[in-house]
């Protein structure tokens, strides 16, 4: 490979490198997390791209084994990654993430490049959780931290201080207005009797509406320094909801999507679960909500006392105003990634469209595909998810799959149709070990530009049944040559010519997956320093 690369470096680049690819090319996977501990459990990456420099990427993730949240930064389009510093929290809230079926953290850039990062901290002594937000103007070298209001704990009111799975939006019209949504009453089945006041399950039973899990949002109008009281985004919804996901409409309205967890009245089958669309026109003060999809029953479990719909992944085309949402269907048949669109600001919705063009080899009744959705500036709709279609280890009668892949599909006609699915990971993910066995799993990370889609996922390739290690991996799905993806239209410190030539050389050498990880960027990456831990000054109200 080196010889071919060296030979090609002296040749002029041809006009072929100026083309726009019809079919995308997938680059080799890059390991993001670099700690060498024998037992590590990095999981549920969230991904964002800088608004002015598509080579600058950030990933938020958490180590499920050490209960640490982390942020990683790349300044060269994801070729290499460096850890940012972790924002300081009070001594009794040092942990991160707990009992999740969604993302443990979220992050987003404001238009001016300010980075906002929300995560769920956990208290080791009680397993209670709360949401923090951090703000950085230097890509994670330093942070300003604030604590969001809590829902409880107040067992008498059936709220237990278990706030998790944040979703973050920075208002495009006013970058000082920050919205953070989260899910309450998560994981309380693992809390001690001293916290719940009961030695029986208190979660989401319809019998007495006890311990309802709800989608909350809090708004800051001063860039995240202080926060308003939380608002329930599901007024009138009597069942437990699943975790909320936020996006912002073209006209500035805040939009939220979440599903439903229904449990029976202790006998018979539960009611069907719905996908909900909630919106606010007054910056998060009040919400109107309506169901936009009803999940059909699963005949494989005709006596099930639980129905679940979650993992709603929304996006908006800022040119047309189209609103999109993808989610995992867990009703009749094998699970699918479904997609709907609205062209009239959410008033009406298209029939659901199946995105995956291959099916898993078994039924299940709990989230496992975790789709994520992103919309490129040019309107291309990108969806990525975990997929079991190639599971060679599945045996008849298994209720748990073994080998998982990451797949991607795109739409260039506003979500009317999707292109053939593309596998983006370069080796199967063995799910016989790792945090997923403890239900620590969540969405694929995704972010889009016109020229590339960036995808991150958790991967066990460096682990085994003894260490059970899991890392975060990353790749690019390119719609343009490497020179354009890594160079762009302005000088960002990396030679576009070198990137393109090396990409061409290795592509020709291997005749398949394009490997670009050998390129050494001329831009130097910042080396974060670890500040002395401090207890930040935070606002810590409790809403009970």
State where each predicted segment sits.
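Extracellular, repeat-based ectodomains that mediate carbohydrate processing or recognition
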Residues: 17-526
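Bacterial N-terminal signal peptides
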Residues: 2-12
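Cytoplasmic C-terminal tails of single-pass
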Residues: 522-544
